[in-house]
Amino acid sequence: MLPETTTLQPLPSVTTIMNEPPARSPMEDYYLFNQFQYNQNPYVYPPQPVYYNTWQDASTHHFDPFQSYQIPSPYEQPIQSSMCTTPLQPLEDSRIIFDESLTKNENEQKSFVEQDSSYESSGNRFGSQKGKKIAKVIRDACCSHCSTTTTTLWRKNDEGNLECNACNLYYRHNKVKRPLSLCKQKPTTRKRRQAKKE
């Protein structure tokens, strides 16, 4: 079979092309129509819950100006029991500054000044606080080996458990756990000489 012959038509002139509007597909029109619709919200939000109590006095209503529903009063929130299983917040960020200049003798209790966690990020770290030591607060800490609660420095062993300074250093030096016969109620401290002032 021979292929069918088609009749060739001449190309249109430039003026006819310039005068005719370009033919667009319906999808292009739909896209342009939807592109410039500002009054429609493209996001669909789920309906917000309404907190409203008809028995409550009108003066105690809490209203969020940015939302169109009522917020419950903080006094109406359920109180969590003391047996709740939520973990406590870590104490890693809480810091204190130990000031040795405030202590007069060894028998007096050491003075502590509460320190805000924004102290380090404020850039004033080396300004007025030069002579003060920064220590982490560890409350209710107990040595995992000798069960003491007082030490000059808390350290972590290889498993990550807290140990007192003496038990940890003894194990690092001798590679043997510290005998409980060496454990004392109060850690021993050195008697340091006072620097002579002229």
UniProtKB/Swiss-Prot annotation:
Gene Ontology terms: cellular component: nucleus
Broad class of the protein's primary localization: nucleus
SMART domains registered for this protein in UniProt: ZnF_GATA (SM00401)
Phenotype on disruption: No obvious phenotype. RNAi-mediated knockdown results in no obvious phenotype. Following infection with P.aeruginosa, RNAi-mediated knockdown results in reduced survival and slight intestinal distension. Double mutation with elt-2 results in arrest at the L1 stage of larval development, reduced expression of gut-specific genes and a severe disruption to normal gut differentiation with the absence of birefringent and rhabditin granules, which are characteristic of normal gut differentiation, largely at the regions of the cell that interface with the pharyngeal and rectal valves.
InterPro entries: Transcription_factor_GATA, Znf_GATA, Znf_NHR/GATA
Compartments, record wording: Nucleus
Zinc finger (GATA-type): 143-167
Its biological purpose: Transcriptional activator that binds to the consensus sequence 5'-[AT]GATA[AG]-3'. Required for gut-specific differentiation, specifically acting with the GATA region-binding transcription factor elt-2 to control normal gene expression and promote normal formation of the intestine. May have a protective role in response to infection by Gram-negative bacteria such as P.aeruginosa.
Protein name: Transcription factor elt-7
Organism: Caenorhabditis elegans
